[in-house]
Regions:
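Active-site Tyr-X1-5-Lys
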Residues: 14-45, 59-69
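Conserved catalytic-site region of short-chain dehydrogenase/reductase
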Residues: 1-10, 16, 47-51
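A conserved pocket-lining segment of Rossmann-fold NAD(P)-dependent short-chain dehydrogenase/reductase
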Residues: 45-46, 65-85, 105, 114-123
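Substrate-positioning beta->alpha
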Residues: 54-62, 79-99
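A secondary-structure boundary/capping signal
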Residues: 2-3, 43-44, 125
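Alpha-helical elements of Rossmann-like donor-binding domains used by nucleotide-donor carbohydrate transfer enzymes
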Residues: 26-27, 62, 89, 93, ...
């Protein structure tokens, strides 16, 4: 796996981490050229999902943990947009790749453009959301026991995936509540 930071564009320009990811990609592409081996290079956006380590490298994990445990969260800019890949969607893509059916793409800056002969691979389902949208959803989830209002959570939606993630951080005493 690689990272969107390998683009070395925008906020990633000049990043040593991004440079190392790009060099790693090139090593795999060279190996494929020399040996004919199939190589699947993925540039993952921000990953999130159940039981991810909070206060490490995932704002979603930190926010879910903190809201579920009545800890403060800090959002410097509610309009900051993240591209997120849910861990279950990543696993589905990895299984497709293992079966010889990765989703091939090329990149238009940071956006995958899916095409049969693409140099890269990408999970077809990601979600672009703002920090403010994430926090607002988490606050609705937290209020559910008090309001008894189940938020609208369509199957396959970002809200459904975030709700599943949030529930994984709830202490067991908060999972049960009176009706």
């Amino acid at each position: 796996s690689s990272s969107i930071q390998a683009t070395l564009l925008g906020r990633y320009a000049g990043s040593d981490y991004g440079k190392s990811k790009l060099a790693g990609e090139e090593l795999f592409f060279d190996y494929a050229k020399q040996t004919g081996a199939a190589v699947y290079v993925y540039r993952f956006p921000n990953l999130f999902g159940k039981w991810c380590r909070p206060n490490y490298n995932s704002a979603v994990a930190t926010f879910c943990n903190n809201v579920a445990n009545d800890l403060p969260i800090t959002v410097n800019d509610r309009a900051t947009e993240l591209e997120l890949l849910y861990i279950d969607d990543l696993v589905e893509e990895m299984l497709d790749a293992l079966e010889g059916h990765p989703h091939r793409c090329n990149y238009d800056v940071l956006t995958p453009v899916f095409c049969a002969g693409g140099r890269y691979c990408a999970a077809p389902v990601t979600h672009k959301v703002t920090l403010g949208e994430i926090v607002d959803l988490l606050e609705k989830f937290k209020a559910q026991p008090a309001t008894l209002v189940v938020p609208e959570i369509p199957a396959g939606s970002f809200a459904k995936k975030l709700y599943s993630t949030y529930l994984s951080y709830l202490p067991k005493e908060k999972v049960i509540f009176d009706l």
